[in-house]
Design a protein with these regions (language model features):
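Extracellular beta-strand/beta-solenoid scaffold signature
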Residues: 11-18, 39-49, 64-71, 87-94, ...
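Hydrophobic aliphatic residue packing
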Residues: 19, 169-171, 184
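Short, function-defining helix-loop hinge/capping sites that tune catalysis or transport
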Residues: 116-117, 142, 217
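Structured C-terminal portions of repeat-based eukaryotic scaffold domains
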Residues: 182, 186-187, 203
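Right-handed parallel beta-helix
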Residues: 2-11, 23-36, 53-66, 76-90, ...
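Acidic, glycine- and Ser/Thr-rich low-complexity intrinsically disordered tracts
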Residues: 192, 197-310
Length: 310
């Protein structure tokens, strides 16, 4: 294993700290920053471990990345904790990864706070078993400054947490507030792909015991499709939690398997919106569903992540 600790990397021309193919990589008390503020010419990634196993990011600070401040991709057995991500496009991003715990972090003044993504056409995909808990994703209010063509260039300013196309994600005990578009979004990957192995829909998502402050007060309808569609569907009455409702056609007709269903246990005051895609496509009646009680169920907590020696 490798431990990197107690230093800073400022104004890197490219990515600040990239690690590929490590088994046991600890990044502790580090800082990556682009000091000129948010610019598309800033490096893409602050902390950037990929294709690695047993990844610890602890007590780190990431500022100003034009893609993601703290990014873990195509990796396995991951802990990101006690860290701060500010003024990045994506604050903290876990992508195409298996078994991750993301907790006790602050994501603020990014475009989007915390992203759990799975994308096609990568050697490792089918991201699963991710816990996001005890974080603050607040006041994410920086305009999207990603260079043209980046997937995170679609993320609207003012997004707290986005889950896209992952399986078995548990989101709990977080504070989401001050996010002008939406506090929590659960969405399918919507672009065309020829990848036969890719599954574009989220499944087995559990959301419970989070705290939601003001959101939806300044939706970024000019970036990507999410905010614009949500603004139109909701007549401008943006919810705390949005699920796009998109599932495979067979499940639209016959329902989802129990273990793939969205489960939500949140306070009465928390607002929710989803869409019935068939009603939406046929235009027969209002496609909107806002009763989160139909998604109430028993939470099956995911196992904590253990990294040997930590």
């Amino acid at each position: 294993g490798v431990t990197l600790k107690d230093f800073a990397i400022l104004d890197a021309k490219g990515d600040a700290l990239k690690v590929i193919g490590a088994k046991g990589i600890n990044m502790i008390n580090l800082r990556t920053e682009w000091t000129g503020g948010p610019k598309s010419t800033n490096g893409a990634y602050g902390f950037y471990p990929v294709e690695s196993e047993d990844v610890l990011i602890d007590g780190c600070v990431a500022i100003g990345a034009s893609d993601a401040g703290i990014y873990v991709g195509q990796s396995k057995n991951i802990i990101v904790r006690n860290s701060i991500a500010q003024y990045n496009v994506a604050g903290i991003e876990i992508e195409n990864s298996y078994y991750a715990d993301v907790y006790d972090n602050l994501a603020s003044h990014n475009t989007g706070g915390i992203l759990i993504f799975d994308l096609p056409d990568l050697p490792q995909q089918g991201g699963h078993h991710i816990r996001v808990f005890d974080n603050e994703s607040i006041n994410n209010d920086t305009d999207n400054f990603a260079p043209e063509g980046n997937i995170v260039g679609e993320v609207p300013r003012g997004t707290g947490i986005i889950i896209m196309a992952n399986s078995n994600v548990e989101v709990f005990n977080n504070l989401m507030s001050g996010n002008g578009t939406v506090n929590l979004s659960i969405v399918s990957y919507s672009d065309e792909t020829d990848d036969p192995n890719y599954y574009p829909h989220p499944r087995g998502i559990q959301v419970h015991n989070n705290t939601y402050g003001p959101s939806g007060f300044d939706p970024d309808v000019g970036t990507g499709d999410l905010a614009k569609a949500l603004f139109e569907i909701s007549d401008g009455n943006m919810p705390d939690i949005f699920w796009d409702g998109v599932v495979p056609m067979s499940q639209m007709l016959f329902g989802q398997p129990k273990d793939e269903k969205l489960v939500m246990v949140e306070g009465e005051e928390v607002s929710f919106l989803t869409i019935s895609p068939i009603k939406y496509m046929l235009g027969i009646s209002s496609p909107i569903r806002t009763d989160k009680n139909e998604f109430k169920g028993v939470i099956n907590p995911l196992e904590p992540i253990n990294i040997e020696g930590i």
